[in-house]
Amino acid sequence: MNAQINCSTRRRQEPATPLAARNLSAGYAAPIVQGVEIDLAAGTLTALIGPNGSGKSTILKSLCGRLRPLAGTVIVEGAELASLRERDLARTLAVHDTSRPSPELLTCRDVVEAGRFPHTGRFGSLTHADRDAVQEALALCHIEDICERNFATLSDGQRQRALIARAICQEPRVLILDEPTSYLDVSSQLEMLQMLRRLARTRGICIIASLHELALAQKAADHVIAVARGGIAFQGSAREAFTQEHMANLYGIDPSSFNPAFGSFEMERPRGSARVFIVAGGGSGVEDMRELQRRDVPFAAGVLHHGDIDWSLARALAVQVIDTPAFEPIEERAIMDAKAALEGCRALIWSLEDTGAVNRRNRDLLEHAKACNLPVYASATELFNGPELYGHAPTF
């Protein structure tokens, strides 16, 4: 009796958090990641992000037991992972990894049904409850219409859906997914992550998934863990994680190239002195700025209010941004700075459709451009293709 109690004490070390790691080091001949500390809550979706080769897959393999830790402990619902029997673990934890199985003579339904193995009896016969679970997983992953097709004939995206359906079919309390959105088109990526979010919330499942699509991770994840340089670089909520400083440190880029409002990186800004001045606001200049960047034309932008969509993008792409406090009429200082910048340019792009009380003074820039005999265009497309609204076309 005492031996059994002691054994239980060794296995049950702390309250039953769905999935945790304590001082985890993982790798092969040598550690790839070290000192990993993770606590994941039920009913949440955690995104694992980081550069290629940083150790995301290594962490996931260690969390599910497919790679033995070099040091530290993985804990599943309060029990050490190493102490759990394979079948018991499979009833609690399901995994989708990046391997690409190619079973012969099996239908898509057969592959999904394999997820019920931990719950079936000795002969592997499916009950009505098992078949209901299979059908629900097929529906969740939108593959009911292809479930009778040979798995080997499916596209990569269809196989991806089927393998995730197999993991869901296990009805786990912990779901580990390595790059679940790979091979999926944009619409399917959105559907998949929305489904996983609902699954976490409605069933109380703890889900952790590695994602390279940062814009999707920012929108879908309750919690974000960033992996870099041999360990956890930072972790926290999406709001805390997706900052310019964190993204710059994580991926080794210019901080201004990451746009937290869009959750995306921008291409490198053109170099050199500004040759075009853009007057924009409220998103009216987004396409014009991107067009100038694609053509490698340096530009200045203003006068933009703090927090405006165009202001956010201009900070990443423009060589100079003249701005003014949000919700306030444009300051005289900003107008003078903008006029000075405009005089050094060869053309003005007037992206605004209209002006109001707070940005009306931008019209001073339009008049100043005409006074300086600078050509004025309604868009970047017109600048490159003509005709100009005023003046003569510049040479770039």
Please describe what each predicted stretch is.
Residues C64:
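Helix-to-loop junction immediately C-terminal to a conserved catalytic motif
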Residues G72-E80:
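Conserved ABC transporter NBD signature motif
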Residues S125, N150-L154, Q158:
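Conserved ABC ATPase signature
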Residues E171:
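Conserved catalytic motifs of ABC-family nucleotide-binding domains
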